[in-house]
Design a protein with these regions (language model features):
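Acidic donor-binding/catalytic loop of UDP-sugar-dependent glycosyltransferases
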Residues: 42, 87-100
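Short beta-strand-to-loop acidic/aromatic patch adjacent to the donor-nucleotide binding site
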Residues: 71, 79-90
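Conserved donor nucleotide-binding strand/loop of the catalytic core
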Residues: 45-74
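A conserved acidic beta->alpha catalytic loop
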Residues: 24, 36-45, 60, 86
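Acidic helix N-cap motif at the loop->helix transition within catalytic regions
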Residues: 19, 41-49, 94
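Cell-envelope/extracellular polymer assembly enzymes that use nucleotide-activated donors
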Residues: 4-6, 31
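Short, well-formed alpha-helical segments that are part of the catalytic scaffolds
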Residues: 9-28
Length: 101
């Protein structure tokens, strides 16, 4: 069962990290948005392998707070909760268990 969570991940050339992050959050999140800045590596191609991931390319405005706020204002969020992750982060099993409880 997926949680009522939308995950927003900001990326720029994160091909070394993004797969692990997505493999971790895609099974539990209803929707995952990757806001790409735009990458010149295989970040976007890796993201396209996941069915509940939508990549939105947006030029990096200069800091992550602005990029995240842009995402909140411009992507369709239909869940009760939003979780922001970096591409090199993942959820520990204990946190996932807590989210389900």
């Amino acid at each position: 069962m997926k949680l009522d969570i939308t995950v927003i991940i900001l990326t720029y050339n994160e091909e070394l990290h993004i797969r692990r992050c997505l493999e971790n959050v895609c099974p539990i999140a209803r929707k995952v948005y990757v806001i790409d800045s735009p990458s010149t590596d295989n970040t976007v191609e890796i993201c396209s392998e996941f069915s509940n991931v939508e990549v939105v390319v947006h030029k990096y405005p200069g800091n992550q707070a602005e990029q995240f706020n842009w995402a909140l204002d411009n992507v369709k969020i239909e869940t009760e909760w939003v979780l922001r992750l970096d591409a090199d982060e993942y959820l520990l099993p204990e946190l996932v268990e807590e989210l389900y409880s």
